Amino acid sequence: MKGKFIVLEGLEGAGKTTALHTVVEQLRSLGITDLVFTREPGGTPLAEKLRQLIKHETEEPVTDKAELLMLYAARIQLVENVIKPALAAGKWVIGDRHDLSSQAYQGGGRGLDRHFMQTLKDSVLGGFEPDFTLYLDIEPAEGLARARGRGELDRIEQAGLDFFNRTRTRYLELVRDNPKAVVINARQNIERVTADIQSAVKKFVESQHG
């Protein structure tokens, strides 16, 4: 079987880290063990430096478009230098965020023009996209409360509840129209969330054998 690219998406506090472990365990139980893990922004030396600029306060205000362009610079470095080579080698790539995050956070939360967003995506990524996306859906207030419980919030996490409400609305619009995406209700108890993720991953893997 060819390598596949699976991405976990969601707001802060949605439980992506726990979900990633569930995805990995389920894939391994199905005999898929040659895995590569990525995170966005980040995943290459240059992309990790950009991550620091994006997520932490700088000496000058970061404009919304500058933020977006840094995200795409980090993303294309990761796609070309890590993800595509891994897929070509038959490995499965598990990503903590990908382009849907930019469409939701910068397109929805920041309110950047959607035509501009789509043009940039097409120019940078071409037709490259995940084979399967799991979107962990949670109420923004609950997610932010969980994130605060982990410690200090980064620059983007400090954006405020209205920002995250807009981000979630855009996420839901995007996954509703994406046949390669599944919504997981992350407000359920951990056992139910785990079972839903296991079921979705199993169904996806089985579909690849068809």
UniProtKB/Swiss-Prot annotation:
Biological process (GO), any one: dTDP biosynthetic process
EC number: 2.7.4.9
UniProt organism field: Actinobacillus succinogenes (strain ATCC 55618 / DSM 22257 / CCUG 43843 / 130Z)
Protein name: Thymidylate kinase
GO terms under cellular component: cytosol
Gene: tmk
Listed PANTHER family: THYMIDYLATE KINASE, UMP-CMP KINASE 2, MITOCHONDRIAL
GO MF, any single term: ATP binding
Function: Phosphorylation of dTMP to form dTDP in both de novo and salvage pathways of dTTP synthesis.
UniProt keywords, alphabetically: ATP-binding, Kinase, Nucleotide biosynthesis, Nucleotide-binding, Transferase
Keyword Lyase annotated: no
Catalytic activity reported: dTMP + ATP = dTDP + ADP
Family assignment from sequence similarity: Belongs to the thymidylate kinase family.
NCBIfam families assigned to the protein according to its UniProt record, in alphabetical order: DTMP_kinase (TIGR00041)
Binding site for ATP: G10, L11, E12, G13, A14, G15, K16, T17
Cited HAMAP family: Thymidylate_kinase
